[in-house]
Structures are given as C-alpha cells and as structure tokens.
Amino acid sequence: MRSPHSLLLALAPGLLAAAPPSPDVRLRAIVAPVSAAHLRGDVAALVGFGTRHTLSSQSDPRRGIGAALNWGEGEFRRYSAACGGCLVTARPSTMVQGERVPGPTRLTDVIAIQRGTERPNDVVIITGHIDSRVSDAMNATADAPGANDDGSGSAAVLEAARVLSKHKFPGTIIYALLSGEEQGLYGGKLLADYAKAQGWNVIANLNNDIIGNSCGSDGVCDSTHVRVFSEGPRWQGREALAAAQRSQGGENDSPSRNLSRFLDSLADRLHIGLDVRQIWRNDRFGRGGDHTEFLNAGYPAVRLSVAVENYNQQHQDVRIEKGVVYGDNIKVMDFPYLAKIVKLNTAALAAMASSPPPPAPRVEGAVSPDTRVQWSRVPGARNYVVRYRRTDSPQWQVTKRVEDSCAQGRPACPQLVVLPHIRVDDWVFGVSSISADGFESPVASAVPGGAFKPYAPPPPK
C-alpha cells in the first residue's frame, strides 16, 4: 500500500502540469523566436532597394519607395499564408503636399491587421517608417540605405508580425510600415486618421525609430538600454484640460507616460538583458517622430530609440571624409541588440492584446482623510489593481488588488475602492485591468486627461 506521502509525490507532477504558466512565462516563450539573423535579412532587403525616399519611384519594380512597400506587403502576405490567413493587409493612402513635398504626391502606408478573437476593436499598433533620406532631404535619387533610420524599425514591425502571427489574442494587433516620415510625419498622420475612420479603440502605438545601433558617434557604446520617449501633460485636449490639471495634477501621468512605465516594468520581468531608460519628453531634443501624430489624434503613443545615437550615420550622404565613415550603413548595426528591443516590443504587443483595456478611473477625497477611487467596469476584466504613489515619485509604490464586484450582465456596473487614511492631496492614483488568465493592462491615472481614449470635454451642465 502506498503511503500518503508517496501518493502526494505521485500526484504532484499532474497538479503542477494543470497549473497554467504565468503571463510572464508565456510572454518569454512567445518572444523567444525573435531572430537577429532574420532581422539582418530584412534590413539587408530594405537597403537593397537603393533609396526608399518618399519622392522616389513608386513604379520601379526594384528601386524606390514603391518597390520597398510592395516587398513589405509581400512579407505580410507570406506570414499570413503560414497562419491560415490570420493577417489582412491594407494600403491606406492619400495625396500630400508641403514644404518637403513640393508637388502633389501619393503617400501610402502598408499595414497588416491581426484581428482579435474577442475584442477586435481594441487595437495596439507597432510602427516603423520605411522611407529613407540622405543629407539633402529633397534628394530622391541618391542611394539612401536607411539601414538604421529606419530599416531597423521596419524590420521590427515585420519580425513582430512573423512571430506574433503564430498566436491568437483577444485584442487586435496592427503592424504598420509608414511612409513620409522624413518629409513631415505624413505616414503617421495617415495611419492615425485611418484608425479614427475605422473607429478603432487604440490602446497604444509603439513607434520604433532608430533602434539598431549600440555605439554612438563619440565612441560610447550601450547595448543594455533602450530609450522610451513619452509626453508629459496630454497634448490633445490641452486647452480644456489645463485648468483641471493645474488643480488636480496630471503633469506626469498622461496615458503615454503610463505606457512608458508599462514597458519599463515589462523589460524588468522579461530578463532579456535590456532595461528601459524612460525619457520624459515627447521625443529627442527639438526633433520628432511618427508617434507624435498619434498623440495629436489623442492616442497613447511612445517612441523607442537606441540608448546612444550615431549622428555620422543619420541623414548623411554615403561617403568617407577625413577618415570618418558617413552614411546609414548596415555594417554599423548591432543585430543582437536590435533583437532585444524587438523582443520587448513583441512582448508588449502580446501583453496588451491579451489584457482588457485600461479603466478610466476618477478620484474623490477633497477635505477628507480618505480617498475614493471609482471606475466603470471594463469588459473582459476579472480583477483590477489600484495603484498609488507619492506625487514626487516616478514609479507606482503601493498596489491593491480588487476583484470585479459586478454580477455578469451588468457592463456599466461601477467599481469603488475606499482607501482609509490615504489623503488625496499627497498621492497620485491609477487603476489597471486584469484578464481571467492574468494579463494586466497599462495603468490609467485618475487625473484630468489620464484615460486612454481621446479626450472629449464633458457635456455642458
């Protein structure tokens, strides 16, 4: 006869096998196939089109922006064929003209849509711009390899599609190759407008622009950090929000700032040898990127970029001058470093497509020793986490897990948490949603403009 102890040992493997792996374990498994060699191949293919300038040929089958876009769409279609048609491609386009586009020009983005199985209207978007340039922003004929700027971001988009299309997610993932960035962020605006026209609930845009070199023009190297740029006070709706933010706070709690915190926390848990360096400004000093157009439309967005830039390789004619090599050449890229950044992107997309959207919390507590945090029920959420931190703290300090208090069939059911002896004056509060299988959304702060949806002023009383 078996002893109870031996019976317990016999049962233990089965019990352990029945327990589902944690979200972090699942995310590590999902991103494991990200390949530095595959990324190198994609960047090499993009460089092979000679130039990808927005004003270059759209009809030449081997050279120019048109050939590059066609190739990118072909890669999306190839990945879709491997997953039974799980990706649907589209080519949003518009006519543009401006300071760096002297005549009316057709501008096209290429996107692949991986529709969610439960919440197809909840969307996360990864972007990289496929266009390139040399020293003269108007030179559309010279070779402009654009290996790092932004072949690296475009390769990240394609690799994310290759890896994630092998899985299914409750929410939708959009993979987007954008045009016209170097001429005026046209591709970002085109896709943000397209998202609005489709009625998508955009949870996040992860814009990847210059993510493939680990050594700067001054010789400083850093392959263990990625910079994440995020706006502070929310830009969209800023006039209407200004007075409320002055009274209630929100300078450091835009949805994009919380998206940056989300990426920072995720990188720490992935254990891939990469740490997020949060940069608390919208973009590099005096410069811009396509994520800005998503922010202008009211969608949460951040820019990911290398820890140290090499200015000799950006926006430069390909040449050697006084022994210095100029030009955006594939030889200066660090593909193992690029692969780590792509793993972070891929994990973030998978996590946000698996979690419910963030709530839209509100806080009350003026002239009271207690604080009340309220929000409406989020479809798909099993639990919530209330977080708070001192007003001068950069990261959330206190967490309180809360079960959904509503009966099934009451989608508008309010949630309420009372925090006794926590004075609202001294803290910033936020709430995240958790799915039934444990995936947690980014935190939305209970401040004016903290909700992840585009800001809409309240109706007049």
Predicted stretch roles:
Residues 434-461:
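Extracellular fibronectin type III
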Residues 381-402:
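Extracellular low-complexity, O-glycosylation-prone stalks/linkers
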Residues 112, 126-127, 131-132, 136-185, ...:
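Alpha-helical metal-binding/catalytic segments enriched in His/Glu/Asp
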Residues 178-289, 297, 301:
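Metal-dependent peptidase/peptidase-like ectodomains
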Residues 369-381:
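Conserved aromatic anchor
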Residues 30, 38-115:
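A non-catalytic alpha/beta surface segment that caps or lines the substrate-entry region
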Residues 417-441:
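Beta-strand-rich modules
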Residues 47, 211-230, 278-356:
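Active-site-adjacent mobile loop/cap segments within catalytic or ligand-binding domains
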